[in-house]
């Protein structure tokens, strides 16, 4: 059967194949406004019991308005998804229901409180105030293993920001861009693809963790994860064959 974008190949891959005791990599998903693409992926990964956090790289949160020149603008870290939902519902419920914004915000407010900005993230600082977020279990320490962005400019922003931070923790992190168009339909497909990639990466990480020992692997040092790091390009290449319409870019950066 022909698969146009990998969706058939990935159906049923919800993380359960790893088993309840399977090792789980920690993920971070990133888009521009932490509303559509990164939140779809955040939800998908959390439903598969992956530890996951999410961010946006924009200066402000921008959502479509009545015209292209009249976006709805909000501040990161200060505005909840619930307040956005209620404001837009009161402004024009019919418009924002028909364009999918209310449905998106309703989903988001069931995942976490509100959009967070990548550049404001204090890596390694405990995220105890996010205990109610979906996917929060395992991310309490403020560290992740894999960052997945959903647009090239977001990937650039993340990589540049990490370089500017100067690697204070000397801890490697894989930064992968999965190019996803910013609409609800493509975000849904992209979320499936990201979950498929997470499953493949996690399977390899579990094997390498078993080989080097849990304590050493979980320490996160470059030496203890070298064999896993070496496998990532091949894993990504195999995944790209399954998802040809989601172009990917990859690099190793440092926290």
Swiss-Prot record:
Catalytic activity: O-phospho-L-seryl-[protein] + H2O = L-seryl-[protein] + phosphate; O-phospho-L-threonyl-[protein] + H2O = L-threonyl-[protein] + phosphate
Localization per Swiss-Prot or TrEMBL: Nucleus
Entry's Gene Ontology cellular component terms: nucleus
EC code(s) of this entry: 3.1.3.16
Gene Ontology BP, a term: mRNA processing
Pfam families for the chain: Ssu72
Record-level Gene Ontology MF annotations: protein serine/threonine phosphatase activity
Main location: nucleus
Keyword vocabulary terms for this entry: Hydrolase, mRNA processing, Nucleus, Protein phosphatase
Family according to the record: Belongs to the SSU72 phosphatase family.
Assembly notes: Component of the cleavage and polyadenylation factor (CPF) complex.
Cited function: Component of the cleavage and polyadenylation factor (CPF) complex, which plays a key role in polyadenylation-dependent pre-mRNA 3'-end formation and cooperates with cleavage factors including the CFIA complex and NAB4/CFIB. SSU72 is required for 3'-end formation of snoRNAs.
Name of the protein in its database record: RNA polymerase II subunit A C-terminal domain phosphatase SSU72
Species this chain originates from: Gibberella zeae (strain ATCC MYA-4620 / CBS 123657 / FGSC 9075 / NRRL 31084 / PH-1)
Lineage: Eukaryota, Fungi, Dikarya, Ascomycota, Pezizomycotina
């Amino acid at each position: 059967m022909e698969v146009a974008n990998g969706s058939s190949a990935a159906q049923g891959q919800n993380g359960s194949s790893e088993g309840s005791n399977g090792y789980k990599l920690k993920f971070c998903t990133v888009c521009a406004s932490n509303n559509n693409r990164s939140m779809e992926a955040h939800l998908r990964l959390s439903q598969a019991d992956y530890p996951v956090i999410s961010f946006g790289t924009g200066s402000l949160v921008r959502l479509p308005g009545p015209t292209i020149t009249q976006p709805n603008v909000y501040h990161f870290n200060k505005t909840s998804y619930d307040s956005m939902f209620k404001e837009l519902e009161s402004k024009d419920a019919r418009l924002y229901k028909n364009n999918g914004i209310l449905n998106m915000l309703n989903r988001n407010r069931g995942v976490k409180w509100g959009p967070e900005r990548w550049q404001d993230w204090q890596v390694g600082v405990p995220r105890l105030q996010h205990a109610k977020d979906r996917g929060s279990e395992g991310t309490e320490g403020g560290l992740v293993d894999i960052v997945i962005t959903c647009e090239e400019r977001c990937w650039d922003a993340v990589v540049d920001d990490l370089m500017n931070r100067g690697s204070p923790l000397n801890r490697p992190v894989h930064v992968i861009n999965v190019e996803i168009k910013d609409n609800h339909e493509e975000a849904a497909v992209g979320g499936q693809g990201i979950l498929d990639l997470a499953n493949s990466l996690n399977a390899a990480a579990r094997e390498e963790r078993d080989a080097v020992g849990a304590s050493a692997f979980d320490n996160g040092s470059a030496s203890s994860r070298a064999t896993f790091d070496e496998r990532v390009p091949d894993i990504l290449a195999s995944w790209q064959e399954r998802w040809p319409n989601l172009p990917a870019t990859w690099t190793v950066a440092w926290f």
